[in-house]
């Protein structure tokens, strides 16, 4: 009661100072509450982020006939009908497609060979959503039979390759990499950003029918901040190093 009386007396005696003090206190309290909300939200988001190892092996295709019977004509996504095969290749591909379909701002793909129609369709959907896509590939494999890279280049996706006979043998994809998203924010002068978080997809597997459905391969999908930052930094380095090849060395066939 005494404290309340003292506060009221201060307000009467010093109305301007008291008003400013109350306003500042309210703002500070709001900031603290907002930070707590952000912290709580961040913890929930991190807990729900993906960290998964996908294994491809000779057992992945034993259920292929069932999926073919249950698939719809012209579908652009893997039709994963109920399947008891824990090694199902189609389910594994669907997990990669799911992450690409979640891309908000950027996809940076460094891939040796890329012929998968399902994954190419998911990249095209991202392009239609306004996602900025960049591809680094091998100078020879961009022309391999069934390569989807030339097709994506025709749609406006910039493609770069090394100026060397050494192989560009990487197989990784960064989705909404923090550094890249910040670059896009500054480039587009965006004031409000949609929620997103960085994902990296990497492993031994090429994005081909055989790699995704017959070979013994592995693929890691993770939202680990350090890993995504490391892959993003290497992509950025290669992108700058191969700058001369964009639009000049890639001749569409």
Swiss-Prot record:
Disulphide bonds in the chain: none
Record-listed E.C. numbers: 3.1.4.-
Outcome reported for the amino acid change (mutating residue 47 to D): In zuc(RS49); produce some eggs with a more normal eggshell phenotype in addition to the ventralized eggs compared to null mutants
Protein's membrane topology: Single-pass membrane protein
Keyword Lipid metabolism: yes
Gene Ontology CC: one annotated term: cytoplasmic side of mitochondrial outer membrane
Principal subcellular localisation of the protein: mitochondrion
Organism expressing this protein natively: Drosophila melanogaster
One Pfam short name: PLDc_2
Protein name, as recorded: Mitochondrial cardiolipin hydrolase
